[in-house]
Design a protein with these regions (language model features):
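Membrane-interface alpha-helices at helix entry/exit sites of multi-pass transporters
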Residues: 1-12, 37-39, 147-148, 172-182
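Generic transmembrane alpha-helix signature in multi-pass membrane proteins
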Residues: 10-11, 19-29, 132-140, 161-168
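C-terminal transmembrane helix pair
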Residues: 19, 48, 144-201
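Helix-coil boundary and interhelical linker segments in multi-pass alpha-helical membrane proteins
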Residues: 27-36, 142, 197-201
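Alpha-helical transmembrane segments
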Residues: 35-51
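Intrinsically disordered, low-complexity non-transmembrane regions of multi-pass membrane transporters
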Residues: 59-85
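Charge-biased, low-complexity intrinsically disordered regions
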Residues: 74, 85, 90-91, 110, ...
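Transmembrane helical segments that form the transport core of multi-pass membrane transport proteins
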Residues: 80, 84-152
């Protein structure tokens, strides 16, 4: 892949896993495996549509051959400790952003009126910052389902910061990333509308 192709893939390839969609959202929030399966299909379809629309809107990538960099062989005694250290760094990176945005969300709740803290707009605000906090604050209703689909498409600022921290150590930029996630959130909302009569009759 070229650098430009990698940056275009970033616009739609960073998505929630099926375990979160089926378990936390479907079974946990809506108490329905059908709702979880619907959210999963909506999530995947919105990502693919966002990718197609993004690539269609951008100029074509010039075809050509790219130099192949062969990986330097490492001895097991050096590769194994490095792998463990890199895994720990990745876990700490994820945990740090999750904790930061969760605390930030709770601080916001502390200063907001109590009536707003239990409302759908508040859940959307929490989900904009940190996905899990927002999803778990949603009501089990049609509006909650639509909001859940949109938040899953967006991903949350916590996830975006995790992605940007990884990109900082690579030659890739995030020029298409946030636009792609915003588009995916909108498409997720639109794709969730036809599912409402079947899930919430």
């Amino acid at each position: 892949l070229s650098r430009d192709e990698g940056e275009r893939l970033l616009a739609f390839c960073n998505n929630a896993g099926p375990g979160f969609l089926l378990g936390v959202c479907g079974a946990g929030l809506f108490s329905s495996s059908r709702a979880g399966a619907a959210l999963y299909l909506i999530h995947v379809a919105a990502a693919l549509c966002a990718g197609l629309l993004t690539c269609r809107a951008l100029p074509p990538v010039p075809h050509g051959t790219y130099p192949h960099k062969s990986a330097k062989a490492q001895h097991l005694s050096a590769a194994f400790p490095a792998a463990v250290q890199n895994a720990l760094t990745g876990c700490l990176n994820v945990s740090a952003f999750v904790v930061f945005f969760t605390v930030l969300a709770r601080l916001l709740l502390h200063f907001l009126p109590e009536a707003f803290a239990s409302s759908l707009p508040c859940a959307l605000l929490l989900g904009f910052l940190e996905l899990t906090s927002g999803v778990l604050s949603l009501p089990c209703s049609r509006a909650g389902f639509l909001a859940c689909a949109a938040l899953l498409g967006w991903g949350g600022m916590s996830v975006h910061c995790q992605t940007l921290s990884v990109l900082a150590a690579s030659p890739l930029s995030a020029r298409y990333y946030l636009k792609g996630k915003a588009l995916q959130a909108l498409l997720s909302l639109l794709l969730a509308l036809p599912a409402l009569p079947f899930l919430f009759p």
